[in-house]
Amino acid sequence: SGSCSLKTCWLQLAEFRKVGDHLKECYDGAVAMRLGRRRTLELRNSRLNPPSADDLVYLQTSPDYCTRNARTGSLGTVGRACNKTSAGMDGCELMCCGRGYDQFKATVVERCHCKF
């Protein structure tokens, strides 16, 4: 028969969450560098392996996100609610930055407009 088949390929972005997770993983493994005498990047710690073309590198350390800093606009984490059972970013271990945290129980009464 004289039928044709058509195949179309296109690039598509990954899910936003996957992109964010990948960037966070790269950020956590970023390699500290310094500007050398010849204005080239050098490892700050010569005992580490040089970064690959896919690695993130940095010249300045990140600000301390735990404490308030008006210059950078960081509000810090003091007074924020954390999740005691989470190992993620909302977990008390990370969010409280080693300062410890207060625990409390709260009972919330809400109208749920339930129908039986």
Swiss-Prot record:
InterPro entries: Wnt, Wnt_C. The keyword Zinc-finger does not apply. Keywords: Developmental protein, Disulfide bond, Extracellular matrix, Glycoprotein, Lipoprotein, Secreted, Wnt signaling pathway. GO terms for molecular function: cytokine activity; frizzled binding. Disulfide bonds join 82-97. Its main location: secreted. SMART domains: WNT1. Palmitoleoylation is required for efficient binding to frizzled receptors. Depalmitoleoylation leads to Wnt signaling pathway inhibition. It comes from the Eukaryota. Glycans are attached at residue 83. The keyword Lipoprotein applies. Ligand for members of the frizzled family of seven transmembrane receptors. Probable developmental protein. May be a signaling molecule which affects the development of discrete regions of tissues. Is likely to signal over only few cell diameters. Belongs to the Wnt family. This is Protein Wnt-5(II). The gene is WNT-5(II).
